[in-house]
């Protein structure tokens, strides 16, 4: 009897190549986790990497060179052997062209094909956190060089008809309806115990949750089940609810390129205007909460409990704004603020509403809006056309993954951060070779973030997943040895 595993998701696919262009949370993003492989794997809740294409690896030359030994059995879904050339080409070309896959390759000087199944990443500087950069995100997956080399990635037909090395291959994408994948027969890696993986496109988030509760689907993506939707999954349903503290936080960031935010007093004033007692009403004890620290408390090895955002103080906020020259005009206005968030993160909308209201209380005229993933990339990431943003993202299992956003040379530094002390702390943590030493430098990083009010922490978010009672093989059940959105180990029970 054929076994289907069904995911109900509100976001359709755009394409199936997140190395070229990442569309966070889309059906294409979810599919790529199952069609392709990475060199190594990391998940949010486990700092140690697991094998994927690489069976084992070596840290050489004081973390300036990383050698990966690839699985000699690995094959592309068209039967072509997967080799070191595929790995070297994918990441070298992504970096050369500035594609999304280059986001975490900042330190890579060049990639050497040592032999057919061995590849060396030569770094321009030591980076003891390099493994988590290769393993933590979908846009680090490897593409087939024999189908991409010499082509324009933006128009390559395999973006829509992918040929991966993973356990599932695409058989049908009907936009607005579904993405259907089937298990690859005689897959070189672990053979799936399900026959088809189906992403069912259901734009209404409430209905996504309901169909899992009814047993018509088996899981939904992040931010589909939220605290206010928990009632949609009754105790006698076909689903159980998995809850967990999240791997990241929602925070308020400044457009540091604007003159008004270059004055630390103005940034500190904004932080003082934020009242977390109102934000905390969005929380769920043990799962999510308002947060005023600069790293998650779950990252105990790196967490600095002394580094905190300024407390709520409207009087201090008003005084600092005046001192920074952001005084009120004759109408009592300190100016306009455009505040954006990414609309796929459902919990960011109420945060935007709260922050907008609190900033209006100190004299700003605030407009806020949620952007789709493509619009976010265009308006915020590339265009810099914003004043403030509410942004999320993982901070676990290693703070090194945050450097792309908050270091001066970070490829995803959309807010224009340029703080020499921040850069120095990241650099020192990369050069350190023990977790204890690295943790000390990350505690210094948080101290600098707090001292200079580089950004404002708002909310440590939680995760809610309604998932089928009739399947086993979720990431948390097998030691986070696979990506959260990888379903190749699922089996019916």
Identify the residue ranges that each predicted region occupies.
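Aromatic- and charge-enriched surface segment that lines or borders ligand/interaction sites
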Residues: 55-100, 114, 120, 211, ...
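Detector for C-terminal structural segments
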Residues: 7-11, 30-31, 174-178, 183, ...
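Structural transition elements
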Residues: 261, 290-324, 343-350
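N-terminal lobe/hinge region of extracytoplasmic solute-binding protein
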Residues: 8-61, 92, 163-165
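Extracellular/periplasmic solute-recognition and catalytic clefts
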Residues: 111-113, 171-182, 198-258, 281, ...
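A bilobed periplasmic-binding-protein/Venus flytrap-type ligand-binding module shared by bacterial periplasmic
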Residues: 71, 182-185, 244-269, 273, ...
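Surface-exposed binding/hinge segments that line
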Residues: 69, 103-148, 172
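Gly/Pro-rich hinge or "lid" segments in bacterial periplasmic/extracellular proteins
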Residues: 26, 30, 41-45, 136-192, ...
